[in-house]
Curated annotation (Swiss-Prot):
Protein name: Protein SREK1IP1
UniProt keyword Metal-binding, yes or no: yes
Keyword line: Metal-binding, mRNA processing, mRNA splicing, Zinc, Zinc-finger
Any one GO biological process: RNA splicing
Biological classification of the source: Eukaryota, Metazoa, Chordata, Craniata, Vertebrata
Amino acid sequence: MAVPGVNKDNIRAGCKKCGYPGHLTFECRNFLRVDPQRDIVLDVSSTSTEDSEDESEEVARAPADKKNVTDTGKKKLKRKKEKKLKKHRKRLHSSSESDDNSKAKKRKSQKKEKRVKHKAKKGKQHKKDKRKEKRERKSSSSSSSSSSSQSSSSD
């Protein structure tokens, strides 16, 4: 059978770096790498008393200050580059917008011209003229239908 002392309930998962349960190895914050050339230094501040916390904070701040100075310089350079890129993009974008606006204006003016021409061709017809045209159509259609009926009867 199975060994009585070993099962999933009895095995506690813990950190392989510091040995404390409650977090996994990749989540371990008890080790700090002060210098990349040196070995890993154990940071016991999370497990020690309140008196030693002040000392460990001061030690931790010193390397962090050096990093902050270099980080701020890098950040400033990045910001400058980003601003330049944004300005360049705006210039390109704004010029294309003005082209689009001019094209849109041309289209609108062409549409207006077409409307004006269409109206001029169509012109205004007065009611009397329309009535005359209708009468002429009716008379021409009735005469043509009567002539067609006469021709069919004569056959």
